[in-house]
Curated annotation (Swiss-Prot):
NCBIfam families referenced in this protein's UniProt entry, alphabetically: GTPase_EngA, small_GTP
Family note: Belongs to the TRAFAC class TrmE-Era-EngA-EngB-Septin-like GTPase superfamily. EngA (Der) GTPase family.
Stated name of the protein: GTPase Der
Residue ranges of domain EngA-type G in the record: 4-168, 176-351
Record-listed GTP 2 binding positions: 182-189, 229-233, 294-297
Cited function: GTPase that plays an essential role in the late steps of ribosome biogenesis.
CDD domains for the chain: EngA1, EngA2
Keywords for this protein: GTP-binding, Nucleotide-binding, Repeat, Ribosome biogenesis
GO BP terms, alphabetized: ribosome biogenesis
Length: 438
């Protein structure tokens, strides 16, 4: 059964993201004093008292939505309200009830969705609570909280889960978590939207439009995926604003909590030094990786074939040469359906377990075909080996002396494992441990 969705809405800077982070117990949304910092819908699963639901943080609703970005944020809020079973309408207890709040309340009443009025920034519960004005909204009894201090959050969550239908939190298999990383404006958000078939992530020609690592839940054929769309990573020297700084950290953290990375390149730019750095982060994090060359529709008439360009990309990213390279267009949809199929293939390799007998046969053959060079009169000897991890696969080789392993021979063994077993799109870790021969 699908988990219920709870959407947090309200005008800018009332503390929606602070409440979102408080409920999650970690900083998932960028929090800043600048109004409108959260622009996209952020999705996270919450477990409260054994009940599970999806919490959605949205951008602030602007009553004077003259700017294009404000209109886009408003559209994101509208979509979140459409898919939510419950809405948390957050207001500022310090500012009191404003005309914008009344206008938003009217919008919520028209939605016919259940609403909990959450009065935030109530930092002192020993004084009379400033709630009288908020009853005027006609949306029920206000719930006072302090998201910053964590006051009354438990009572709020009790109210949230109280109205959920029985069985709504049945456990399901874990979704595949996919980090979408790349330089600013290579089309990461457009690509996610093309896969999803709807605009969940704000798309703009302005680099850096996506500020948060935006978690988007997606289902296909009974399989769940979570796309983590990060702000584009810029060169370190360019990072001056705190929001850009946090976005770079968020991209790295997104890789840490993902299973697989889509490293997005821009066909019109070729492979840049920054692309190499970002691909390197995915490799260092030990994630399954797919290289996605976006804007391939612009290759038409250029005389460049997909196979030739893919080889060029592999040469430029030779350190991650095991990663599949897909040429797609988020605008036209060209090649986009292949992405999830490739994700499934790579995830199968990422979680693959090799029988110990097969692994020993492969590596013993590798030692026989090309024996390791002697060093200081000693030669590396393999006793036996075993797989010690998946995601990514890691193999532990028990040898007479790990100090005899050269970087070149380690690469040779990895290549032999790949030649025999594949592991397309997946880093392979070869580890060594001393064991004296009997």
């Amino acid at each position: 059964m699908t988990k219920p969705v709870v959407a947090i809405v309200g005008r800018p800077n009332v503390g929606k993201s602070t409440l979102f982070n408080r409920i999650l117990g970690r900083q998932a949304a960028v929090v800043d004093a600048e109004p409108g910092v959260t622009r996209d819908r952020l999705y996270q699963e919450v477990d409260w008292a054994g009940r599970h639901f999806i919490l959605v943080d949205t951008g602030g609703i602007e009553s004077q939505a003259g700017e294009d970005m404000a209109n886009r944020v408003f559209d994101q809020v509208r979509r979140a309200m459409a898919e939510a079973q419950l809405i948390l309408y957050v207001l500022d207890g310090n500012a009191g009830l404003l005309e914008e709040d009344v206008q938003v309340a009217a919008l919520l009443r028209r939605s016919s969705k259940p609403v909990l009025v959450v009065v935030n920034k109530v930092d002192d519960f020993s004084r009379p609570l400033p709630l009288a004005d908020f009853y005027r909204l006609g949306l029920g009894e206000p719930v006072p909280v302090s998201a910053a201090q964590g006051l009354n959050i438990g009572d709020l969550l009790d109210l949230v889960v109280a109205g959920m239908p029985a069985g709504a939190d049945e456990p399901r298999s874990e979704p595949v978590r996919i980090a979408v990383v790349g330089r600013p404006n290579v089309g990461k958000s457009s690509l996610v939207n093309a896969i999803l078939g709807e605009e969940r992530v704000i798309v703009s020609d302005v680099p850096g439009t996506t500020r948060d690592a935006v978690d988007t839940l997606f289902r296909r054929d009974g399989r769940e995926y979570v796309f983590i769309d990060t702000a584009g990573m810029r060169r370190k020297a360019r990072i001056r604003e705190s929001i850009e700084y946090y976005s770079v950290l968020r991209a790295k953290k997104a890789l840490e909590r993902s299973d697989l990375a889509l490293v997005v390149l821009d066909f019109t730019d070729g492979v840049t030094n920054q692309d190499q750095r970002i691909a390197g982060l995915a490799e260092e994090a030990g994630k399954g990786t797919i290289i996605v060359v976006n804007k391939w529709d612009l290759a038409e008439g250029s005389g460049v074939s997909a196979s030739r360009y893919q080889e060029e990309v592999r040469r430029e990213l030779i350190f991650i040469g095991y990663a599949p390279v897909l040429c797609v267009s988020a605008v036209s949809g060209l090649g986009v359906p292949k992405i999830l199929d490739t994700v499934e293939s790579v995830m199968g390799e990422y979680r693959r377990q090799i029988p110990t007998s097969m692994l020993n046969r492969i590596l013993q053959d590798a030692f026989m075909i090309s024996p390791p060079p002697a060093r200081k009169g000693k030669r590396l000897k393999l006793m036996y080996c075993t797989q010690v991890a998946t995601g990514p696969p890691a193999f532990l080789l028990f040898v007479n002396d790990p100090g005899l392993v050269s970087p070149g021979y380690r690469r040779y063994l990895e290549n032999e494992v790949r030649r025999a077993l594949g592991f397309k799109g997946v880093p392979v870790r070869i580890l060594f441990r001393r064991r004296e021969s009997k």
